[in-house]
Amino acid sequence: MPIRALCTICSDFFDHSRDVAAIHCGHTFHLQCLIQWFETAPSRTCPQCRIQVGKRTIINKLFFDLAQEEENVLDAEFLKNELDNVRAQLSQKDKEKRDSQVIIDTLRDTLEERNATVVSLQQALGKAEMLCSTLKKQMKYLEQQQDETKQAQEEARRLRSKMKTMEQIELLLQSQRPEVEEMIRDMGVGQSAVEQLAVYCVSLKKEYENLKEARKASGEVADKLRKDLFSSRSKLQTVYSELDQAKLELKSAQKDLQSADKEIMSLKKKLTMLQETLNLPPVASETVDRLVLESPAPVEVNLKLRRPSFRDDIDLNATFDVDTPPARPSSSQHGYYEKLCLEKSHSPIQDVPKKICKGPRKESQLSLGGQSCAGEPDEELVGAFPIFVRNAILGQKQPKRPRSESSCSKDVVRTGFDGLGGRTKFIQPTDTVMIRPLPVKPKTKVKQRVRVKTVPSLFQAKLDTFLWS
C-alpha cells in the first residue's frame, strides 16, 4: 500500500520497496534518486531548497509505522452520484477528444497544404536557379564574345596597317627608281613621313640580310650535295666490284656443282659395278673388297636422328670380345690393306671382335654375337649386313660334317661403309671357301636391278633405324 507522499526527483510515491532518505533541511527523497542527483549535479545541494548538503547530514533510511485503515460503509446514492460524476467527466473527456481530433485533422490538412506549397516552391526555386545559371552562362558567353570581337577588331585594324605597309614595301622592292621617288614624294614631309622612311630602310636592310643568309645556306646545301654525290659514286663503284666478285663466286660454285654431279655419276657407276660384281664367282671376291675400300665416306653429311621403331634401348658401347685369331691377308689383298693404312683418315672400316662358339655341333651353324643357329643364320644378324654378304650367307651350302668333328669359327665381324653413304656390318671369313655366292644366273639383254629387302629385327632396334636423311 503506497504512502501518500512522493519524491520530487522521480515524481513517484514512497513505498516499502525502496529506501527513503532525508536531508537536514527536512526534504525526503528516494535514496537512489538522491545519490544519482549528487553524482550528476555540479554541486551537492538539496534538489528542492538548494541548500548545501554534506555527506554526514544525510539520513540514508527512514522507517514509517502505518496504521490499518478502517473500512468505510459505502451508500448506494453516494455511489450513484460518484458514477454520474465519472460519466460526466468521461463525456467531457470525449468531447474534448473530439474537439482535439477535429483540430488535429485541420492541422493535418493545413500541414499537407503547406507541404504541397513547399514542394511547389522548391520546384519553382529549382527552375529559377536553373534559369539563373543559364542566364549567367549566356551572359558570360556574351561577354566573352564581346571581348573576342574587340580583339578581332584590334587585330583586323593592326593587320590592315601591316598589310598596307607590306604592300608598300613590296612595291618598293619590285618597282624601279622613278616609281620609288614618286612614292616618296607622295608621302610628303613631316615626322610621320620620316618614320615611314625609316621603317622602309629597316625592312630593306632585313631583306638584304635574309637574302645573304639564304645564299649562304644554298651554298652549304650545294657543297653537301656534291659530297653526297661523290660518296654515292664511290659506293656505286664498290657495289659494282662486289657484284663482279659475286659473279666470279657464282661461276666457281657452278663449276663445283658440275664436279659434284660428275662425282655422283662416278659413284652411281661404282654402285652399278658393285651390284654386277655380286653375281660373280667366288674367285672375284677380291673385286668386292676393292670396291668397298675405294668407296669414300661422306664427310659433310649431317645425319639426323629419329625415334627407333622399337622401344628397346640400344647399347652403343656394346662390343663383341671373341678370342678369334687375326686373319692373315692374302698376297692379292695385301696391297689394299696397305692403301687402307695410308688413308686411315678417309677409311670407314673398323674391326669389331666377335664372339665364337666353341664345342661340337651336329649341323652347319653360324656363330654371330655368341649365338648359335642351326640350319639357318639369325635373321637379326643377317639384316645388319649388306646385300652381297646376306646373299652369300643365304646361298651358302653348309657341308655336312661328322658329329665327332669339333670346329671353331674363325670369322671376323667388321664395320664399314656399304658404298651408299652409310655404315653396315659384314662377316669377313679367314677362309674364302666359307662364303659362297649365289649361283650365277644367265644374263639377259635387259639388266634388271634386284632389290633385296632387309628383314628388320624383331628383338632389338638397330642404330640404322635412328638415321634418316
From Swiss-Prot:
Intracellular or extracellular location(s): Nucleus, Nucleoplasm; Nucleus, Nucleolus; Chromosome; Cytoplasm
UniProt keyword list: Chromosome, Coiled coil, Cytoplasm, Disease variant, DNA damage, DNA repair, Dwarfism, Intellectual disability, Isopeptide bond, Metal-binding, Nucleus, Repeat, Transferase, Ubl conjugation, Ubl conjugation pathway, Zinc, Zinc-finger
GO MF entries: identical protein binding; ubiquitin protein ligase activity; ubiquitin-protein transferase activity; zinc ion binding
An individual GO BP term: negative regulation of tumor necrosis factor-mediated signaling pathway
Pathway participation: Protein modification; protein ubiquitination
Top EC class for this record: transferase
Main location: nucleus
GO cellular component: nucleolus; nucleoplasm; nucleus; perinuclear region of cytoplasm; site of DNA damage
UniProt lineage: Eukaryota, Metazoa, Chordata, Craniata, Vertebrata
Coiled coil regions in record: 70-177, 201-280
Record motif PIP-box, residues: 460-469
Protein name: E3 ubiquitin-protein ligase TRAIP
InterPro entries attached to this UniProt entry: TRAIP_ubiq-protein_ligase, Znf_RING, Znf_RING/FYVE/PHD
Post-translational modification remark: Sumoylated; sumoylation is required for nuclear localization. Sumoylation increases protein stability, possibly by preventing ubiquitination.
Name of the gene this protein is made from: TRAIP
